[in-house]
Amino acid sequence: MVDASQYLSVTALTQYLKRKFDADPYLAKVYLTGEISNYRKRVGNQYFSLKDDHAKIGALMFRNAFSKVQFDLEEGMKVLVVGRVSLYEPSGEYRLIVEHLEPDGVGALYQAFEQLKKKLAAEGLFDRNQRPLPLFPKRVAVVTSPSGAVIQDIMTTVARRYPILQLTLFPAVVQGDQAADSLVKRLNQIKTIGGFDAVIIGRGGGSIEDLWPFNEEKVARALVDMPMPVVSSVGHETDTTITDFIADRRAATPTAAAEIVTPVTLIDALNRISEDRVRLVNAMHNRLKNAAIRVQRSAQSVVLTQPDRLYDQYVQRVDQFQQRLQQSMHNRLRDADHRLAMATSQLDGRQLFIRLVNLQRQVTGDRHRLDQAMRGLVKTKRQAFASAVSGLDHLSPLKILGRGFAYVTDKQGQMLKSLSDYELDQDIHIHVADGQVGAHVTTKEKTHG
């Protein structure tokens, strides 16, 4: 029989185990890798679990340590953790006190995703592509794996909704290191060919590593350069990629993507055409009916029932013009008859002879008066000319010189008129009636003025 003193209380055992945990150097600082689980962000200390495929451990990160984490924790994020193992006495559970935490694997990818997302958003690329899709597309390009369920779902949906749409598959690698380059190559090929109304790019679900090619910057920029609307259908509805932000539309599934590019089904289109046909027929019927009413009203109008009234006033005006024309012609003929009678009377022979004699006398008298006037004018002009010649002769410099006067010039022929024009030692020329005399200035003396 075991002594009662050998039984330990739960508290005692828990305290003992806690001391063991705290004293064990291997548990004082442990390095773990795991996936975050049961995480819900709180104010202050953070509680969550770390798990792998076979085990799970509770974790606690105090406020001071958590404030140093530069990224947001998310459910399922793989992390590298440094901490110590301790036992929580009230519940008897051991847990990890996390002192340092950083992303690992998917966590690192998530951090890269956030960085690229912020970069592209700052460039305004997420708000750039908001182009509308055509109601009745003719050609749509699909960039995806040729063997996956994505293309099958798209083809099935299009065949059901809008079978006249031409789908063109551009097969691409959608997972792995070569996927991003393959996607960019196919997008550039679509842009070069041209003529497509829209592009669907996508793949099925998977881990973040599987979906990572659709988070590559080169793929995002290739999508930005596409000249037609882009529909993204990557992963499941809960998955979000950079491609989703860049695309004009995001579809949760390949079926939804096919529905987006075929907004109007063929049946809807045919029904709409039928409705438009009915509206067109009704509109034409109404127009014809209205036209018939107008024709009937026109047939009953005065213009058609009494057409003579249209040109009554013109007939009256023609009559007035005719009367005025006849009166004008009558007056002109009467005046012509009068002038003819006058001319005839003036052509009488005796009257003509008398007129000729009178004209001859008039011409003779005019000629005599003209001769007298011409002789008087010539005599007057001759006298005036002789007087002018005599006056000019008296004013001639030669006449003046002939009376003993002279004029003086310098070597250049400039006339020297006053004392100021002369210079001492200057050679001058004195002009007289029959020649000139050279002289030299030796003195200057002002006599008056």
Swiss-Prot record:
CDD domains: ExoVII_LU_OBF (cd04489). It comes from the Bacteria. One of its GO terms (molecular function) is nucleic acid binding. It catalyses: Exonucleolytic cleavage in either 5'- to 3'- or 3'- to 5'-direction to yield nucleoside 5'-phosphates. This is Exodeoxyribonuclease 7 large subunit. GO terms for biological process: DNA catabolic process. NCBIfam families: xseA. It holds the Pfam family Exonuc_VII_L. GO terms for cellular component: cytoplasm; exodeoxyribonuclease VII complex. Keywords: Cytoplasm, Exonuclease, Hydrolase, Nuclease. Bidirectionally degrades single-stranded DNA into large acid-insoluble oligonucleotides, which are then degraded further into small acid-soluble oligonucleotides. Belongs to the XseA family. Heterooligomer composed of large and small subunits. It is found in: Cytoplasm. It comes from Lacticaseibacillus paracasei (strain ATCC 334 / BCRC 17002 / CCUG 31169 / CIP 107868 / KCTC 3260 / NRRL B-441). Its main location: cytoplasm. Its EC number is 3.1.11.6.
